[in-house]
Amino acid sequence: MLKNLLSSRKGEGYIDMCVGVVVFVMILVIAINIFSFITLKVEMDQIAGDLIEVATYAGEFNEDFWNADSYNLEQYYDYYVQYGADEYFNSSYHRVQLGERMWVTVSKDTYIKGLGIFRIPITVSVTKSGLSERYWK
């Protein structure tokens, strides 16, 4: 009886359909994750562009830079900011001389969603750079 049950092909279409649905759902989850990561990257590119624009215009990482950072934090989501310059004119004030390179890195820790109890961490980061537009005497 068990041998007849195992060799029976009556439920084959049902199993194929279930496997097909599971594969389709997994492909859909992957597509949604890729789309959300692309959207996150575009938003972070906008944030980094805003921050480097403020920093290069002022020629330093001052209150205007941190005010722009606070504004972006209110508009978007929590993220990490790293900043620096190739060479500082005055390192105590984080001032950068005209024509020197300044950079801002914005990063966000997130997870791949839709995998149930499995949490796969992903760090998305964007780096923008620009030249200081201020001459310091």
Q: Where are the regions that the model predicts?
A:
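Residues embedded in well-ordered secondary-structure elements
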Residues: 33, 93-95, 117
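Alpha-helical assembly-interface signal, strongest on the long, hydrophobic N-terminal helix that forms
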Residues: 2-66
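Exposed boundary/loop context
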Residues: 4-6, 92, 109, 123
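Short amphipathic secondary-structure patches
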Residues: 46, 50-105
